[in-house]
Curated annotation (Swiss-Prot):
Keywords assigned by UniProt, alphabetized: Amino-acid biosynthesis, Histidine biosynthesis, Hydrolase, Methionine biosynthesis, Multifunctional enzyme, NADP, One-carbon metabolism, Oxidoreductase, Purine biosynthesis
Catalytic activity: (6R)-5,10-methylene-5,6,7,8-tetrahydrofolate + NADP(+) = (6R)-5,10-methenyltetrahydrofolate + NADPH; (6R)-5,10-methenyltetrahydrofolate + H2O = (6R)-10-formyltetrahydrofolate + H(+)
Protein name: Bifunctional protein FolD
Source organism per UniProt: Mycoplasmopsis pulmonis (strain UAB CTIP) (Mycoplasma pulmonis)
Record GO cellular component, one term: cytosol
Pfam family of the protein (one): THF_DHG_CYH
Record-listed E.C. numbers: 1.5.1.5, 3.5.4.9
GO biological process, one term: tetrahydrofolate interconversion
Species classification: Bacteria, Bacillati, Mycoplasmatota, Mycoplasmoidales, Metamycoplasmataceae
Length: 272
């Protein structure tokens, strides 16, 4: 019987630890989210991040701009935010603007997502940096569930900046045998993976023929079709073949939010 892996217990433990850590600091930590436009999914994610921040004693503030906001106004806003806040997130996706240009407006030492190009460069060169939040989340999740990647075939489907690329690098740094798949490669070969991490946003993409017997499947995909939520895994197809899997809700997502605030705490410590 395929086992469902969840993050409830992990998040509960880590949240309590973070709450205690922040309470012992000699300052009130302030965190800002910049949201441009009215993407419905982005609003949900922003709400969850603000709720988490408030729960652990971090002051949170949303800076919400219209999609057609003037670029110079944005630049001025980032300068003001940088002066007042300890950690900053630019909520993605962003339309109509060069994302790198916006990310460079965030001080690399306040960049909770680890996506500022300077942080990214350091990360891919295996230098000290802020770890991209989703990669950190997947790693934390695997460790909590005692899933070792060392010398295992850990394959990644999807090469996104947020998930696929950073987690692939993180796995290589931790002695996994990594292979990456995307639209250009197709899925042939995924069935050899001991652990398969999927992050494409294509609903029910991965079926029984794409996986190895008794493999572990980590689903970071999220799709909403006719008000129903799907991950990248076709659960009905894989349920007799996989050993363990994560659902699209209650697994990696909550740990990603947690990871942002682990990054924030480490940022504060480095400044002391």
């Amino acid at each position: 019987m395929m086992k469902k892996l969840l993050s409830n217990e992990l998040v509960q433990i880590k949240r309590a630890e973070l709450k205690e850590k922040f309470s012992k600091l000699d300052q009130k930590v302030k965190f800002a989210i910049v949201l441009i436009g009215d993407n419905a999914s982005s609003k949900i994610y922003v709400k969850k991040k603000i709720e988490f921040a408030q729960d652990i004693g971090v002051e949170a503030k949303l800076f919400h701009f219209e999609e057609n906001v003037d670029f110079n106004l944005l630049k001025d806003a980032f300068k003001k935010i940088d002066k007042e806040y300890d950690g900053i997130i630019l909520q993605l996706p962003v339309l109509h603007f060069d994302v790198n240009e916006l990310l460079l407006m965030i001080d690399k030492n306040k960049d909770l997502d680890g996506l500022n190009p300077e942080n990214e460069k350091a990360f891919y060169e295996n230098r000290e940096c802020i770890i991209p939040a989703t990669a950190r989340a997947i790693w934390t999740f695997l460790k909590f569930h005692k899933i070792s990647v060392e010398n295992k075939k850990v394959f990644v489907v999807g090469q996104s900046r947020l998930v696929g690329k950073p987690i692939s690098q993180f796995l290589k740094n931790n002695n996994a045998i990594v292979r990456v798949f995307d639209k250009s490669t197709g899925l042939k070969g995924t069935e050899e993976a001991d652990i398969l991490i999927v992050a494409t946003g294509v609903a029910q993409l991965i079926k029984a023929e794409n996986i190895k017997e008794n493999s572990i499947l980590i689903d970071v995909g999220f799709s909403k079709i006719n008000n129903k939520i799907y991950g990248d895994l076709d659960i009905e197809s894989i349920k007799e073949k996989a050993l363990k899997y994560t659902p699209p809700i209650g697994a990696i997502g909550p740990v990603t939010v947690l990871s942002l605030f682990e990054n924030l705490y480490e940022i504060i410590l480095k400044k002391k």
